[in-house]
């Protein structure tokens, strides 16, 4: 199996890492899937990554049809609206890798195109947007981790992806424990993203505050209880996958970046999913319930819901 046509859906923080790496391959077709005004903007402006403009092809979903590999790099909230595009891209032999956060995007995609197309995967990259585009440190980036959900783990498509990435500066590795790896990253996201987003401080807060560490640990305990109930043994991968990318103490992860920019977050994918799973399994999730409602309230604040200015304010009472 050779991968010669690669389509990337989503050219944001995660997609930028993929585009940066695969643009070095001159022996493949590389395109970003986009149409309408967004597609025109990408054709005109390209993708600004680490101070350089990259110009992959821009394909409509129909033009990208039957790509050998489709890499999905969307925000969680955008996935339901993108399923028609994913179906249009997917041909009989298309492999799909979802580099989205969380642990259920593969299930959502599989419901639209069939689970046989999915090669389970994740990415660890500390990417952020500045005025001149997206930035990340290639050297400290952990990169892309992928593997088959079921044996054989050294399948032809795993070997094909290894060969594709091997000719680039992308950091990557294949694993026999992809579900445990995904839950390990999910744990990092929940425990590191959410408390700092509520506080509005850099990640150094976990090192410097016993209170922030206590909140992070509470979220961790709930997640690990749910994972154990689902038969996910994250101890299998703790030695190789228990840490994220090295960052400065001032670093702000994706949830706080979203709030800083006035965007809605992926809290439904993080605590929202854990609350749902906890209810299904009979496992209490008070830390995640608090984080969920606090971040939802911060979204409402960004939306202007609590803008109590003006002369004609209706009186209210605490209750």
Which residues does each predicted region cover?
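NAD(P)+-binding Rossmann beta1-loop-alpha1 motif at the extreme N-terminus of oxidoreductases
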Residues: 1-55
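NAD(P)-dependent Rossmann-like dehydrogenase/reductase catalytic/cofactor-binding core
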Residues: 2, 217-319
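Glycine-rich beta-alpha junction loops
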Residues: 37, 101-103, 122-127, 150, ...
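Rossmann-like NAD(P)(H) cofactor-binding subdomain of soluble oxidoreductases
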Residues: 51-135
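Short, well-ordered alpha-helices that flank and scaffold nucleotide-derived cofactor binding pockets
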Residues: 20-24, 84-88, 111, 272, ...
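A structural signal for isolated positions on well-ordered beta-strands in alpha/beta enzyme cores
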Residues: 7, 29-31, 97, 119, ...
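Internal alpha-helical scaffold of NAD(P)-dependent oxidoreductase catalytic cores
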Residues: 88-89, 112-117, 132-235
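Short, charged/polar "capping" segments at the starts of alpha-helices
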Residues: 38-43, 106-107, 154
């Amino acid at each position: 199996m050779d991968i010669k046509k690669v389509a990337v859906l989503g050219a944001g923080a995660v997609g930028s890492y993929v585009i940066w790496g695969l643009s070095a391959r001159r022996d493949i077709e590389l395109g970003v899937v986009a149409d309408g005004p967004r597609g025109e903007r990408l054709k005109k402006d390209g993708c600004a990554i680490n101070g350089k403009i990259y110009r992959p092809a821009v394909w409509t979903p129909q033009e990208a049809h039957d790509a050998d590999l489709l890499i999905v790099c969307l925000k969680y909230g955008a996935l339901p609206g993108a399923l028609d595009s994913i179906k249009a891209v997917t041909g009989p032999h298309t492999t799909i890798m979802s580099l989205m956060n969380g642990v259920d995007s593969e299930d959502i995609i599989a419901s639209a195109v069939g689970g046989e197309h999915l090669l389970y995967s994740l990415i660890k990259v500390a990417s952020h947007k500045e005025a001149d585009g997206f930035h990340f440190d290639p050297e400290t980036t952990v990169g892309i981790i992928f593997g088959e959900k079921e044996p054989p783990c050294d399948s032809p498509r795993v070997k094909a992806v290894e060969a594709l990435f091997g000719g680039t500066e992308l950091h990557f590795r294949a694993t026999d424990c992809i579900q445990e790896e995904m839950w390990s990253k999910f744990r990092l996201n929940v425990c590191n993203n959410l408390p700092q987003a509520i506080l509005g401080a850099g990640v150094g807060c976990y090192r410097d505050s016993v209170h922030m560490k206590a909140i992070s640990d509470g979220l961790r305990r709930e997640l690990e209880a749910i994972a154990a109930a689902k038969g996910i043994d994250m101890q299998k991968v703790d030695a190789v996958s228990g840490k994220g990318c090295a960052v400065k103490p001032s670093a702000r992860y994706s949830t706080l970046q979203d709030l800083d920019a006035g965007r809605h977050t992926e809290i439904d994918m993080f605590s929202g999913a854990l609350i749902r799973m906890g209810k299904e399994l009979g496992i209490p999730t008070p830390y995640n319930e608090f984080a969920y409602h606090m971040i939802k309230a911060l979204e409402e604040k960004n939306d202007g819901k609590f803008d109590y200015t003006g002369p004609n304010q209706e009186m209210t009472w605490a209750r």
